[in-house]
Curated annotation (Swiss-Prot):
GO cellular component, one term: large ribosomal subunit
SUPFAM superfamilies: Zn-binding ribosomal proteins
GO molecular function: structural constituent of ribosome
Name used for this protein in its record: Large ribosomal subunit protein bL32c
Subcellular location: Plastid, Chloroplast
Zinc-finger among keywords: no
TM spans (from-to): none
Length: 52
């Protein structure tokens, strides 16, 4: 089993965590943008059934 030789510095830990959080933030922004375009009807990549 692999074991780290030295302790990871706090700054490196913060950098990695911030990078991870930023990825989640951009995924949420994209999802919200897609939901907005579908709800307004401006989406060109989807076919949404309209209720009659």
């Amino acid at each position: 089993m692999a074991v780290p030789k030295k302790r990871t510095s706090i700054s490196k830990k913060h950098i990695r965590r911030n990078f991870w959080k930023r990825k989640g933030y951009w995924a949420a922004v994209k999802a919200f943008s897609l939901a907005k375009s579908i709800s307004t009807g401006y989406s060109k990549g989807f076919f949404v059934r309209q209720k009659k």
